[in-house]
């Protein structure tokens, strides 16, 4: 059985499993953080390569991921029910600030979340319109759509979904809910209900993409503050990581990848220094906090054939200086 199959969960094929873990340049006695436990594919592979003195802290805000993580009975492993933006606080709690040898982040929604209709992430399966990563906190998608203004909704769809028909779709959603309230009927509260409304609002269809794809993505990203969380954890990695500590990040859409790419590029170039200052090369280099490791990595044709959802994945790796 291949390593990829051994460590992936039956319900979830971990994307870029070997590549992301290899990017951490594991030390047998190192301290590592899996910021997105999911169903544990990356965590299990990391644990298999650590000595008895190694340590792995996993983080996830999905209650079902916590249930899965608690099945791992290993003294080197612990799970934290939290967002990965809380990694600095978690490290401070255990006295690990500046001592972590690697952080792995596998962004976006997992296959079990997509495949579970009750989570409300998929426009292909009928379920409650929820979309929260942590179902114990915040507004569901249905609750938020019932109170958001047309203008704000259009902004969310355009900003986080890059949806060209954002205004049309926002108007259709807000008008539907407004009419439902006036008629004392149910507001939008099912995934297929929303998907069908979006399809009817879009003037023409992209034959390669479902009309609801970008809208569902935008609402999910906004409700879960995904880009804010990502920006926070990227910045905190500079403090949490030890010198030569690695940051290995898998993203699944252009907004995430753009943010990761720009962050790593900026930190590897250092601060802009005005021309003409009498500085030596080593003084200029001090402003750099990271160095990028290799080029961006994408799944092989073989991996995409086995797991089509991996097609859009991009892995970027950097090392703290």
Curated annotation (Swiss-Prot):
Keyword list (alphabetical) reads: Cytoplasm, Methyltransferase, rRNA processing, S-adenosyl-L-methionine, Transferase
> At the top level of its lineage, which domain of life is listed?
Bacteria
Record-level GO BP terms: rRNA base methylation
Cite the binding residues for S-adenosyl-L-methionine: 40-42, 60, 84, 106, 113
- Is rRNA processing one of the keywords UniProt gives this record? yes
Question: Is Transcription one of the keywords UniProt gives this record?
Answer: no
An annotated Gene Ontology molecular function: rRNA (cytosine-N4-)-methyltransferase activity
Name the reaction it catalyses. Answer: cytidine(1402) in 16S rRNA + S-adenosyl-L-methionine = N(4)-methylcytidine(1402) in 16S rRNA + S-adenosyl-L-homocysteine + H(+)
Q: What Gene Ontology cellular component terms go with this record? A: cytoplasm
Name where it's found.
Answer: Cytoplasm
Task: Report the enzyme's class at the first EC level.
Answer: transferase
Main localisation, per the record?
cytoplasm
EC number assigned by the record: 2.1.1.199
Q: What does this protein do?
A: Specifically methylates the N4 position of cytidine in position 1402 (C1402) of 16S rRNA.
Q: Which family does it belong to?
A: Belongs to the methyltransferase superfamily. RsmH family.
Would you tell me the protein name for this molecule?
Ribosomal RNA small subunit methyltransferase H
- Species per Swiss-Prot/TrEMBL record: Actinobacillus succinogenes (strain ATCC 55618 / DSM 22257 / CCUG 43843 / 130Z)
Q: What is the lineage of its organism?
A: Bacteria, Pseudomonadati, Pseudomonadota, Gammaproteobacteria, Pasteurellales
């Amino acid at each position: 059985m291949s390593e990829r199959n051994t460590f992936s969960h039956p319900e979830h094929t971990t994307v870029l499993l070997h590549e992301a873990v290899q990017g951490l340049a594991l030390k047998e006695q190192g301290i590592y953080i899996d910021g997105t436990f999911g169903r544990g594919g990356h965590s299990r592979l990391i644990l298999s390569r650590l000595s008895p003195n190694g340590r792995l802290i996993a983080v996830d805000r999905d209650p079902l991921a916590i249930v899965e993580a608690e099945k791992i009975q290993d003294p080197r492993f612990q799970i934290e029910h939290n967002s990965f933006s809380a990694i600095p606080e978690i490290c401070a709690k255990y006295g690990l600030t500046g001592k972590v040898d690697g952080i792995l982040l596998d962004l976006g929604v997992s296959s079990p979340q997509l495949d579970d209709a009750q989570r409300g992430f998929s426009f292909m399966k009928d379920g409650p319109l929820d979309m929260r990563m942590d179902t114990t906190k915040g507004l569901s998608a249905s609750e938020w759509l019932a109170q958001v203004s047309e203008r704000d909704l259009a902004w969310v769809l355009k900003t986080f979904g890059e949806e060209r028909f954002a205004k049309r779709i926002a108007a259709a959603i807000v008008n539907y809910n407004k009419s439902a309230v006036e008629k004392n009927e149910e507001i939008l509260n099912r995934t297929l209900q929303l998907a069908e409304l979006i399809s009817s609002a879009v003037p023409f269809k992209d034959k390669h993409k479902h009309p609801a794809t970008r809208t569902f993505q935008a609402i999910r990203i906004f409700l879960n503050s995904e880009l804010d969380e990502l920006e926070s954890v990227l910045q905190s990695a500079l403090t949490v990581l030890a010198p030569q500590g690695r940051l290995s990040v898998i993203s699944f859409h252009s907004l995430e990848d753009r943010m990761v790419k720009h962050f790593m590029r900026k930190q590897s170039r250092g601060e802009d220094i005005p021309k003409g200052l009498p500085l030596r090369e080593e003084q200029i280099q001090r402003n750099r906090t990271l160095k990028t490791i290799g080029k961006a990595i994408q799944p092989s044709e073989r991996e995409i054939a086995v797991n089509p959802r991996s097609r859009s994945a991009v892995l970027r790796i950097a090392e703290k200086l």
